[in-house]
Design a protein with these regions (language model features):
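DNA-recognition helix of helix-turn-helix
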Residues: 119-142
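Short amphipathic alpha helix immediately N-terminal
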Residues: 93-107
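N-terminal interaction/assembly modules
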Residues: 1-88, 92, 139-150
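N-terminal positioning helix adjacent to the helix-turn-helix/winged-helix DNA-binding module
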Residues: 81, 96-97, 129
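Short alpha-helical "recognition helix" segments of helix-turn-helix
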Residues: 113-118
C-alpha cells in the first residue's frame, strides 16, 4: 500500500530542510573557527607538532569537508522539492491560495504578516483560506500518486 502524502506535511518538508541547512551552516562556522584557532595555535608555537595534533587537525578538516558535502546535498534536495512543490501549487491552486502557500511555505512568513500583506483577517488566512489551499493542493498530490503507481 502506498502512503499518500498530506499536502501540509509535504510543504513543511521545505521548512525542515531549510532549518537543517541553517543548523549545518552554523556548525560549519564553528568547526571552521575551531580549525583556524588550532592551526593558528600550532603555528604560533613554532614547534614541531606531534602526530596526535596533526590527526586532530586532519579529523577537523575531514569533518568540515563532510559537512560541506551534506549541506550541498541538502540544498539540492530543497531546491528540487521547492521546484516540484511550486509546479504543483501553480497547477492546483487558485491565485489567492497560491499566494498564501508561497508566502507561508516558501517565504516562511507568519500568519499575521500574510494577513496584512493579503488584506484579510488573521482568522481568514490561517484557517479558511489555508484549508482551501491545502485541499486544492491535496487533490493534485493524490492525482499524481495515482499516476505514479500506474
Amino acid at each position: 500500500m502506498v502512503k499518500i502524502v498530506k499536502a501540509e506535511e509535504y510543504l513543511k518538508e521545505i521548512r525542515t530542510l531549510d532549518i537543517l541547512i541553517e543548523e549545518n551552516f552554523e556548525e560549519l562556522e564553528k568547526l571552521d573557527a575551531l580549525s583556524k584557532k588550532v592551526t593558528s595555535t600550532l603555528s604560533d608555537a613554532k614547534v614541531q607538532s606531534s602526530s596526535a595534533e596533526q590527526s586532530r587537525v586532519e579529523a577537523c578538516a575531514i569533518k568540515i569537508a563532510c559537512l560541506k558535502d551534506d549541506i550541498l546535498k541538502d540544498i539540492n534536495r530543497m531546491l528540487d522539492l521547492k521546484k516540484e512543490a511550486h509546479n504543483l501549487i501553480i497547477k492546483s491552486c487558485s491565485p489567492k491560495c497560491m499566494q498564501l502557500l508561497f508566502k507561508r511555505y516558501f517565504e516562511f512568513k507568519n500568519w499575521e504578516t500574510i494577513a496584512i500583506e493579503m488584506g484579510f483577517t488573521y482568522q481568514y488566512v490561517s484557517d479558511k483560506l489555508h484549508k482551501r489551499a491545502l485541499n486544492q493542493l491535496q487533490k493534485n498530490l493524490e492525482k499524481n500518486e495515482r499516476v505514479d503507481r500506474s
